[in-house]
Amino acid sequence: MIVAQVFFEDINNEKNKEAFKNYLRGKDLMFVGVGTTKAYLDSCGPKICSKLKRDNLTVFGTEEDQFHGANIERKINVLNDVYKNKFKIAIDSCVSEAKEINSIILDNEGLKPGAGMNKIFPRVGDFSLKIVMSDSADEIIKYTTTSSCEVNELKKVFDRVDRAVQKTYTFIMMCLRELENEMKLKKWS
């Protein structure tokens, strides 16, 4: 079920941050990046998890060790066995309506990878952050092979993905820092 939708220009909205933090409080967290850098519009999950890994957070599915449709059935068992006690937050790019592009959909039911491409894979995570990158699965496929694309067109796509990664990463880190500060205040009171 969708808990909140956060548009990039509104990541500081207290109501949206609180909706996310409510699911994080008191949990042993990890982040799961779903997607591939071979399809640039589908690369948000591994790119964000690579950034979170540099902040020493527990992650699965980075740019260096991707978690995507070609390996999900093999790797999901590792994820669920090794990290069975973690609260898994799945992060993936997704396809939705045009009016939802440049937003993050917070969902408390985990993630159904490949749904936008009509593929059926096992559900991933306990909670998900779905980054709306396009309103068309065809656009995702178009940027899988870049040989037919103009350089200027590719640059725009790269900029879109970079912005989505930065905004989502910022939203996650703001919420985690606020939770950390709440814990410190409780400890001192």
Language-model region placement:
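N-terminal catalytic or cofactor-binding beta/alpha core of small enzyme domains
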Residues: 1-189
